[in-house]
A protein has these predicted regions:
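Conserved C-terminal alpha-helix-loop-beta "cap" of PLP-dependent enzymes
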Residues: 1-8, 22-157
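Catalytic-loop motifs flanking and including active-site residues across diverse enzymes
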Residues: 10-17
Length: 157
């Protein structure tokens, strides 16, 4: 069965410090931290949606404080998410584009995860760089899109 997993590997020292923070902050403190992450993710999704070419798959409301998007169906956007990922990398962002597992390999997505420490200022800077990339693609359409292999990224297979 095809799956879509989020894998994280963290050193044990960070687990110990997280446990300490949980004891220090308590349930209510952790709830506030997580709610702040959700609000930032929802703000990012709302602003990204306004840009036009993106279809929001998950807007950070419930579940993980993450935003996942793809390009809207129909029409030639003049770029792929692989192209956008590459362009964002030149500005210092790592927002990979990748296709889904078998049975949905036709769907290419990008996503961000909002963790503690990511601020609205950070996401606003990312939104500005996405807008800058869209303007570049509009003025200088990509004549040959990057392939999945050329763009690199993560494979969930």
């Amino acid at each position: 069965m095809p799956t879509f997993a989020l894998n994280f590997s963290r050193p044990a020292g960070q687990i110990v410090s997280q446990y300490y923070n949980f004891l220090r902050l308590g349930f209510e403190g952790y709830r506030k931290v997580q709610n702040a992450c959700y609000h930032i993710a929802q703000h990012f999704a709302a602003e990204l949606r306004k840009m036009g070419p993106f279809e929001i798959i998950h807007d950070g409301n419930g579940g993980l404080p993450a935003v996942c998007w793809t390009l809207r169906d129909g029409g030639d956007h003049g770029f792929t998410l692989y192209d956008l990922s590459d362009r964002l990398r030149t500005r210092g962002w790592q927002v990979p584009a990748y296709s889904m597992p078998p049975a949905r390999e036709d769907l290419v997505v990008q996503r961000i995860l909002v963790r503690h420490g990511v601020t609205r200022d950070h996401t606003d800077l990312l939104l500005e760089d996405i807008q800058r990339a869209l303007a570049l693609f509009k003025n200088h359409p990509v004549s040959r899109n990057l392939t999945k292999t050329e763009a690199g990224g993560y494979n969930h297979n």
